[in-house]
Amino acid sequence: MFTSEEYGERWAKYIECKHVAVDYNRNVFPVSGTMIRANPYRYWEWMHPIVRAHYVKRVVLLGTDSTGKTTLARALAKHYKTVNVPEYGRIFYEGFSEIPDAPEKWVPEDLVHIARIQSETEDWMRRKSGPVMICDTDAFATQLWNWRYYKEFNPEIERLIKPADLYIICGTDIPFEQDGMRLDDQSTRKGHQLKTYDELERRGWPYMALHGNLENRIAKATEHIERLFLADPGIPKTA
């Protein structure tokens, strides 16, 4: 057994193996398990990616069509030098539209598939993330789209939902841009936004709303994120 702990000898004796002391004075590796548990963000680079994943704070962007989610997600990920989990639904749609004679409308199973892959992608990218992980969307957002299309929540999608540490609702006060897959119906868009607020309130999950241009949104989002998650001086501000 290799340890840097004083109790290593007793532990090795208990399980009947040889103990090899390594770097008792922490000259080579200036960190310990006790130090990491006390402030994991201060010693982020010393943790294995699997361990880091446990401590990652997940920030998810929400909003109806053309509210600047993707642009803001990329900007926040760049600001914090962390990962941006992309929107799998868009990838799925673009591939789906290339299939000859593909159905014109999605079916509920498509949204379950999208939510599942989105969640799996998040789990994988947590290991690549910094202390804060930015998500363009998540399974909860997919559930809101399921409600928009079918006026009900899908229990299969519900089982995939993992509440985020913070949800950011992007406002509709920016010019609408049609990219071929968005629905330019003001009543539907407004209903989607209102349902987003209602559900976050009902579930008691933390959220903030953003309005204004991109620069204002970045400033307000980073201020809120840093106040919530990065206020401890031990957490590196990588911007």
What are these regions (language model features)?
Residues M1-K57, L62:
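Classical nucleotidyltransferase
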Residues Y14-K18, Y80, P163, R203:
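Short, structured coil segments at secondary-structure junctions
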Residues K69:
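Conserved lysine of the Walker
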Residues R74, K78-D123, A221:
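Conserved substrate/cofactor phosphate-moiety recognition/catalytic segment
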Residues V112-K162:
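Glycine-rich phosphate-binding loop used to anchor ATP phosphates in small-molecule kinases
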Residues Y150-N216, T222, F229, P236-T238:
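A glycine- and Lys/Arg-enriched "phosphate-lid" helix/loop adjacent to the NTP-binding pocket
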